[in-house]
Amino acid sequence: MNVTGIKTKKITVEDNDLLKILDEYVVEMREEEVLIITSKIVSICEGRVVPINSIEKAELVKQDADYYLMAPDNKYGLILTIKDGHLIPWSGIDESNGNGFFIRWPEDPYKTAFKIRDYLVERFGLKHVGVIITDSKLTPLRWGETGLAIAYTGFKPLRSYIGTTD
């Protein structure tokens, strides 16, 4: 499969139609291509935003996380969480480029990934199209962040090499 990244304008809380954004920026797709879209764009379009001045971030984290660890002596003020099976800080809640809003993860990222894929299949008349919804994550005891697929559809994400030559 080929992976295609597409640059868009800055998506803001005024943008609430994901399919309209796809219409504007995804002008063509071919068989076996994968569209990668950030969870931030999906979340904004789904209205998963909360004004920063309406709630403490820690309270929002508690609402969204499956599990959380709030260490009172944490010099970085970081809250580690497990959200949808992922170890991720702040339950995936982002405020960078949020223009005064906390941006939560999509409510059901797989449902949205399937919706996007169905739309692309119908729009372009294709059969084999993939969609990945991404975010970034931390790795404990490492600096930096790594890309993370929080949802995918349209392809097998892993290939088994058991029984093959190394």
Regions found by a protein language model. Give the residues of each.
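N-terminal and secondary-structure boundary signal
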Residues: 1-166
